[in-house]
Swiss-Prot record:
ANK repeats lie at residues 62-95, 100-130. The keyword Repeat applies. The keyword Repeat applies. This is I-Kappa-B like protein N3. Keywords: ANK repeat, Host-virus interaction, Inhibition of host NF-kappa-B by virus, Repeat. It holds the Pfam family Ank_2. It comes from Microplitis demolitor bracovirus (isolate Webb) (MdBV).
Length: 163
């Protein structure tokens, strides 16, 4: 289920980002990703430059980047749209979490977010060099009643294996 995008630009402008980053290790992209504020993320487009892009690779106190937070806090279409925009701005789909080495794809698999998992499999830059994905595919194949859904899962998986 998608959350409403209740973007609050005023709150973001009033935040002391230096202090916030000292306590949490999080910059504005983490907050936007956590709250699912896609509209606000789109408005930042004009501000993204070479000086801002490194913020997309910063890690919070838990060792996550904003792209991990987007996958952890959101599901389905909302997660896809946030991650897509963060990648467009310069985030890396294959960055691993410091706490357990998971990528965004690992998070999607663990959260059983089928929509996000299939979308990630279709991304040309995604790294599938882990057996978690094979087990996920097999589990999904067992669960799916519809032949069409089975084919979608297999097709996405096979596309990535042979790209």
């Amino acid at each position: 289920m998608e959350r409403a995008d209740n973007s609050n630009l005023e709150m973001l402008l009033e935040t002391d980002w230096q202090l916030h980053q000292v306590y949490t290790g999080e910059n504005i992209f983490f907050v936007i990703a956590k709250l699912g504020w896609l509209k606000t993320l789109h408005t930042l487009n004009v501000l993204i430059d070479e000086e801002i892009k490194p913020w997309l690779q910063q890690r919070n106190k838990l060792g996550d980047t904003c792209i991990h937070v987007a996958a952890l806090a959101n599901r389905g279409k909302q997660a896809i749209q946030l991650i897509e925009k963060l990648v467009e701005y310069g985030a890396n789909l294959n960055t691993r979490r410091n706490c357990n080495g998971d990528t965004v794809l690992d998070i999607a698999v663990k959260n059983k977010d089928h929509e996000l998992t299939v979308w990630l499999w279709k991304q040309p830059s995604i790294n599938l060099q882990t057996e978690k994905f094979f087990h996920y595919v097999m589990d999904q194949m067992k669960l799916k009643e519809s032949q069409e859904n089975k084919m979608e899962i297999l097709e996405a998986y096979m596309m990535q294996l042979f790209k």
